[in-house]
């Protein structure tokens, strides 16, 4: 009889209440979800940094292309102006009021 009581006592100690079992299950799922959340967050941050770097390189490339195009256009206009003044060197310079400035249009 004494042996049965001690076995029941030992068995009762090995059982956990339902709330503790639920807490253990939830905490185990929480750590798994947290681990994957951290991994996915790090991947997302690296992806955003990569995209930002690519966009910056595209912008720098466009700035360089626009600078080259602008300098070519300015050189073309300067050559056209020099050609006009070289053809008729005795003609007076045009008055500044006859020149149309793009901001005035």
Swiss-Prot record:
The chain crosses the membrane at residues 29-49. It is a single-pass membrane protein. GO terms for cellular component: membrane. It comes from the Eukaryota. It is found in: Membrane. Residues 86-99 have a biased composition (Polar residues). Residues 86-105 are annotated as: Disordered. Keywords: Membrane, Transmembrane, Transmembrane helix. This is Uncharacterized protein F59B10.6. It comes from Caenorhabditis elegans.
